[in-house]
Amino acid sequence: MSHFLQYTDRAWGLIRTTGKSEQYVHSYFTGYNIPCYLPHIRKVISKYKSVRRIMFPCYLFVAWGDQDVAIMKNCYHISHRIQSEVNADNNIIEQMEDIYRIEQLSEIGDFPLTKTDSNQSKLIKLHSGPLKGMRGHWVNSTNGQSQFKVCLNIVGTHYEIAFNKEFVYQKSEAIAV
């Protein structure tokens, strides 16, 4: 089941906002009924406190077409637009699905998101569990436990999210994603 639609008159793309105005741009597009997605991730601050932060600061996924360009030009908080061709945005939709799954998984655990320069050729693909279909690599953490780091490539920037070995091998049915 896909959470993001592929439109016939719009294509999904990425928008870079100025400063930290992605929340404003999200509400601006929502007001004009332009589909957009602003991913959040849960971050544990202390033992009893956690907050939801924007996963990719200054970036926002938006589906726009020719009819929406005039509306976008009126928003002064947009610095760049990166759009794919209409009906050729499967790669972006696939990335958004992975990001959505990670966003849902962050509600049950604290998974650090870091920028990296990982080598994409050495990645393995998981075939079962809650991270099924995601690509990454195994590493040994400082406390001696194995972690699986999921690698995401968003506009040429590589991100890694670390998951514990026990989480990777959990049954898929136990986690509703």
Show where each model-derived region lies.
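Short coil-to-beta-strand transition motifs
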Residues: 126-135
